[in-house]
């Protein structure tokens, strides 16, 4: 059209283009913040997180089953530097097992473009100190975050998970991988540490100065959810009671979210306690100790595990709802 406009209209064209660019910027920014509809709905948004989604087919299965979030185990390899979706890093040795993290992102985004958009991707970082940011950025946690920006650019939240797998002189919590995220997390990114309320609080007090309270999450549980679960009334230690205390910290603005793991298809009582008394924001579900822990797939066990969470939310629709793409855990 512009090829037929006179020069006198040039200034109007430029003004129109500038206006269009500004509108696009506003739309893009809105996509990365809580949508007005989500903000107006005061019900508690819940995240049904598919467990151990370490295959491309697992991404598809989780979305098919109604999961609005997934947990991916990520392992680093050096020379060539890369991250892959795999659970047992130490046993793999030099064998590069599992799909590349890039291919997992590709699958997540292809589903999102087809209208099947996840709300949250939780990265369980198995070896966060394996590579240094300066020496080998590609296999460092900083490099992992570089890749994860493709998810946040699409409006998908990313949670970086640190569980104390190693300890000693090279702790995961507070180590160089953890430090590489300090002061860098964007509005769609958060960091979680595993443990009791006091353990998590201590971890952030010692090593969390670069993480505002609105980016901090707490997770607690076991691959055998029955182990140490309790009944949400104990003073300390037990899973549900500690998460209940964490929910109090969240409500007071000291945490962004509380999350638990891992329920399977025959755990309705535990789902009820976690979402009801424990008031968690999300639960990892799929194969657990009862079924034998393995990668998420298109099985009835995995489908029913996610279904238990969705069913609970449906029964409590006056106070709870499933989190959607417009919801935000972090602030």
Segments the model singles out, each with a brief description of its role:
Residues 1-39:
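Secretory targeting and sorting signals
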């Amino acid at each position: 059209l512009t090829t037929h406009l006179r020069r006198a209209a040039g200034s109007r064209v430029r003004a129109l283009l500038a206006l269009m660019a500004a509108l696009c910027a506003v739309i893009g920014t809105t996509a990365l913040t809580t949508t007005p509809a989500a903000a107006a709905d005061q019900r508690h948004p819940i995240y049904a997180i598919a467990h151990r989604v370490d295959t491309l087919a697992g991404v598809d299965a989780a979305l098919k089953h109604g999961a609005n979030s997934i947990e991916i185990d990520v392992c680093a390899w050096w020379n060539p530097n890369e991250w892959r979706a795999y659970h047992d890093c130490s046993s793999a040795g030099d064998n590069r097992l599992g799909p590349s993290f890039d291919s997992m992102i590709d699958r997540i985004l292809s589903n999102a473009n087809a209208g099947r958009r996840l709300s949250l991707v939780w990265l369980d970082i198995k070896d966060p100190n394996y590579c240094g940011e300066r020496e080998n950025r590609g296999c460092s946690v900083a490099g992992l975050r570089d890749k994860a920006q493709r998810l946040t650019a699409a409006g998908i939240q990313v949670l970086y998970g640190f569980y104390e797998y190693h300890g000693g002189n090279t702790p995961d919590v507070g180590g160089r991988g953890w430090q590489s995220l300090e002061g860098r997390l964007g509005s769609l990114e958060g960091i979680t540490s595993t443990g009791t309320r006091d353990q998590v609080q201590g971890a952030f007090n010692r090593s969390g100065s670069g993480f505002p309270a609105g980016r901090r999450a707490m997770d607690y549980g076991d691959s055998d959810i029955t182990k140490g679960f309790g009944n949400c009334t104990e003073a300390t230690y037990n899973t549900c009671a500690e998460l209940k205390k964490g929910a109090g910290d969240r409500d007071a603005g000291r945490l962004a979210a509380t999350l638990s793991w891992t329920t399977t298809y025959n755990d309705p009582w535990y789902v009820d306690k976690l979402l009801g008394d424990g008031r968690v924001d999300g639960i990892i579900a799929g194969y657990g100790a009862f079924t034998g822990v393995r990668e998420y797939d298109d099985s009835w066990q995995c489908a029913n595990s996610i279904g238990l969470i969705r069913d609970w939310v449906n029964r409590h629709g006056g106070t709870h709802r499933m989190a959607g793409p417009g919801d935000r855990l972090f602030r």
